[in-house]
Amino acid sequence: MSADPVRVWYFRTAGSALGDTLVWTLAPVYFVTVVGLSPLQLVLVGTFMELTIFVCEVPTGIVADVVSRKLSIVIGYLVMGAAIVFSGAVAQPWAVMVAWSVWGLGYTFTSGATDAWLADEIGVDNVRPVYLRSAQLGRACALAAIGGSVALGLLSLRVPIIVGGVVIAATGVVLALVMPEHGFRPAPRDEATGTVRAMIGTGRAGARLVRRTPVLLLILAISAFWGAWSEAYDRLGEAHVIRDVGLPSFAGLSFIVWFGVISAASLLLSLFVARPANRRLERASRQTITRILLTADVALIGTVVVFGLAGAFWLALIAMLATNTIRSLVGPLFSSWLNQSITESSVRATVFSITSQADAIGQWTGGPAIGAVGNVFGIRAALVLGASLLSPAVALYARAVRRDGLAQMVEAGA
C-alpha cells in the first residue's frame, strides 16, 4: 500500500513536528533542572551527537543512494524514537549523552534521504512550494504539541520526552507501510563490485560534484559556520534564561508553563511572518533567495548578541523570539537552494549528507570551546562568541551575490 508522495511528505512533516515539539519544548529544562548538566556538559551532549553524525553521515547517505531512500528513512525514525525514549527514562548525564549519540546515528539515515526522496518522486522543480507549505504545516502541528508537552511536563519532565520518542518511532512504522518509492534510481553498480564498492564509488562521485561546483563549496562552508553558532544557541539558550535572566513571577505561572508560552509565542510569530513571505518566495529567483539568506544571517548576529547580553526578561524574550522566527524562515529556503544546486540525482542524498556533515563539523569543533567559555566566563559570553561565528557565513553569502547568483555559479562550475 502506498500513497501520494506529497501527502506522505506532509504526514512525515506532521509526525516529526509533533514528536520533536513534545520533546524539545521542555528537554532543555529537563537537562538543566533534572539531569543537572553544566554549560560544558550541555554542549558536550551536542558534541557527541554531532561526532556520531560526522562519522555516519556519508555512509548512511550512500545507503540511501545505492539501496533505498525509503528503507533509510524508516530505519532513521525508529532509531531516533528509541533513543529519545531512553534519554527520558534514564535521567543521568551519561545516559543523555549516549542516547543523543544514538539519535545522531538515526538522524543520519534521514538527513539526506528525505529531501532526495521528495525530489525523486515529484521532481526537483516542484520541491520549493512543498518545502514552504510543509514548513507551515510543521509549525501548526508544533503549536498543537506545545500544549501537550506542557501538560505532560507538569506531571513529570520525563513524560513529554518519552511520549515524543514514541510518536517519532510510530511515524517510522507508518512510513514503512505507505511511503511510495517509484522515482528512485539506484546508483549503478556492477554485480562483481558489490554494494560496498558501489557505496564508495557513489561517495566519490558526490565529492567530485561538490569540488567542481563552486556554489556547493560555498554551501558547505556556510553550513559549517551555521553549525558552530547554532551549537551555542541551541544548547545554552534556555539555560541562559533559567540561570542568568530569570523568569518573572506573573499569575503564579510555573517555569514549565513559561517555556510553553515562549515556544507558542515563537511559533505564532513564525506563522504570522512566514505566511505572506512563503507566497512570494515560491516564485522568487535563486539570486533573491541568496540575498534573503544573507540578510537573515546579519539579523541573526544582532538578535543573538542582544539575547546573550540582555539582563531584563522582556528584552531577552524579544531577542529570542526574533532569533527563532528568522531561523524558521531560513530552513526551507536553504534546503531548496541546496536541492537546485545538485545536478545529478544519483548522488543527491550523498551531497545532502555531506552538507549535514559540514554542519556537524562546525558544531563539534566549536562546541567544546564554547562550552568551556560558558563554564569559565558564563553563558552570556558563550552566546556572544557563538553569534560571532556567523560572520564568515555572511561573507560567503555576499560572495555568492557578487558572482551574479546561484545559476551563474553552477554553470561556471559545471
Predicted regions and their residues:
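Conserved MFS/SLC helix-loop-helix module at the cytosolic interface between two early adjacent transmembrane helices
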Residues: 53-91
